[in-house]
């Protein structure tokens, strides 16, 4: 067991090693509560181990439960018991997940439940290419925030100090309130979502740098998109409630809108 890491248990594995390739068949590993099963084949494993040359591989990955938060490094700041922010000895460490430059992997993923930060993803499926410090995602589909998302794009740490995310999202029946609850970016850019009832669909394209906590840096963000909703209601906004009381129009406390489409552009 490694310090600050969950217990690792290899339940089963069929291991084949030759000078040309390394193959793992039906390898099942439990890391704490997390499980992962992989069929994989790696080439140039000796050159990778001895000379640091590129390791090539293909992987088919399956999992019932995988909590990415268990593997995120601590950031350089921690909250003290008094509530003050204190800097620890690991000030140089960040929560950035750095993609190795000397691997070339083709991956098929089928993950039943994935947790990351405050978000939960179910039935995540798609293809990923990991190469040159970059993860390309193709038709990565998942259920989240009450609806469904399909993602295409990339995450790059070619510059490890400035990770970059470029992604296109196709959204179907996402809950406004759930998006506000789970996405820090929505809380900062669209706090009104907290008071909206209903679902939305549409598409979003975004390019942004990421900070040490893997959150978008809003000053660098660019993008566009279109969102539509067929049944939307707004309530619980204090300022609107006060106006409704002042003019004696209680029906204004809950406003309803149908068949609305919003096109938008994001600029730094």
List PLM regions with ranges.
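Small-residue helix/turn framework positions
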Residues: 1-42, 46, 52-79, 100-115, ...
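Intrinsically disordered, low-complexity segments enriched in small/polar residues
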Residues: 73-98
């Amino acid at each position: 067991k490694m310090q600050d890491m969950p217990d690792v248990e290899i339940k089963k594995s069929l291991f084949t090693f030759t000078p040309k390739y390394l193959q793992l068949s039906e390898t099942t590993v439990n890391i704490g509560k997390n499980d992962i099963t992989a069929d994989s084949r790696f080439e140039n494993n000796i050159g990778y181990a001895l000379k640091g040359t590129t390791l090539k591989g293909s992987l088919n990955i399956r999992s019932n439960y995988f909590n990415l938060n268990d593997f995120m490094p601590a950031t350089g700041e921690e909250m003290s018991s008094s509530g003050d922010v204190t800097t620890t000895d690991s000030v140089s460490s960040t929560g950035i997940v750095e993609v190795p430059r000397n691997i070339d992997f083709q991956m098929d993923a089928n993950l039943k439940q994935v947790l990351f930060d405050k978000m939960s993803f179910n039935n995540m499926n798609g293809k990923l290419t990991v190469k040159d410090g970059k993860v390309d995602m193709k038709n990565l589909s998942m259920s989240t925030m009450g609806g469904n998302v399909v993602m295409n794009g990339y995450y790059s740490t070619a510059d490890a100090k400035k990770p970059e995310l470029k992604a296109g999202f196709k959204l179907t029946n996402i809950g406004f309130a759930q998006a506000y609850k789970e996405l820090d970016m929505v809380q900062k850019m669209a706090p009104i979502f907290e008071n909206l009832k209903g679902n939305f669909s549409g598409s979003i394209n975004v390019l942004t740098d990421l900070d040490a906590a893997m959150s978008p840096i809003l000053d660098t963000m660019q993008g566009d998109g279109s969102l539509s909703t067929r049944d939307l209601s707004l309530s619980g906004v204090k300022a609107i409630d006060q106006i409704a009381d002042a003019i004696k129009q209680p029906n204004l406390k809950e406003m309803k809108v149908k068949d609305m489409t919003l096109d938008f552009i994001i600029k730094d």
